[in-house]
Amino acid sequence: MLITNENKLLSLYIHWPYCESKCPYCDFNSHVNEICDPKQWIKSYTNQLLDMNEQLLNHNVSFNNLNAIFFGGGTPSLMPLEIIDSILRTASNLFGFEENIEISLEANPSSYEKEKFNDLEELGINRISIGVQSLNDENLKFLGRRHSSLDAQLAVEHAVNTFNNVSVDLIYAFYGQKLLHWTNELEVFLKHNDLQHLSLYQLTIEKGTRFYTDYKKGLLNVIDNDYAADFYE
């Protein structure tokens, strides 16, 4: 997906729909699939980028260069490196890159993905967004996450030593979460001088998720709005 702004700069969103597992709260377009044919995906992404470029030309849309590329998902850090490399090369050839282009990619704190950070940086990724979600192992288990608190902390440390721009995602206001734990997590990351951004998401129960099914069956508790507001404040 391409987006233009008033300065005629382009932003590009690339979606990778696969994850190692489906989180119980997630209603995004994501699927569990261990089979991936890199050549077929490269062909598909290339064709899509060519189509986008043709649409811009056909509609006489004037633009300068790409100033941002965002790889989302799903879990795009699971993408084979050759696919990412092909996308970036094709996008650069078709649209051009601003000198200070931001190329961002979402990642989970698993050891497999952490080991790819150096390779991703060499390909041109200069911003990483890590789905930490919590630093409490019990809360991570409730949220269906496959990493531990230690995994998350090690991944963040490796990320800040690899990338100049690192963001962390956290989830709050879910049943069983303690306000003290939440406050401590915020303090850990707010005191981290090498982090550029925190994204905080209140847990919502969305249709089509396992949490929604459990909630409708009376198997999942949710906290009341007043207590949720305490986490926000």
Protein language model regions, located:
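N-terminal [4Fe-4S]-dependent radical SAM core
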Residues: M1-L12, H59-F63
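Intrinsically disordered, low-complexity peptide-like regions
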Residues: N5, Y13, Y25-D27, E106
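Structural motif
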Residues: L9-S11, C23, E102
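Alpha/beta-hydrolase
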Residues: I14-W16, V132
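Local cysteine-cluster metal-coordination motifs and their immediate loop/turn environment
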Residues: P17-S30
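Conserved non-cysteine loop/helix-boundary elements of the Radical SAM core domain that shape
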Residues: S30-L57, V61, N65-E233
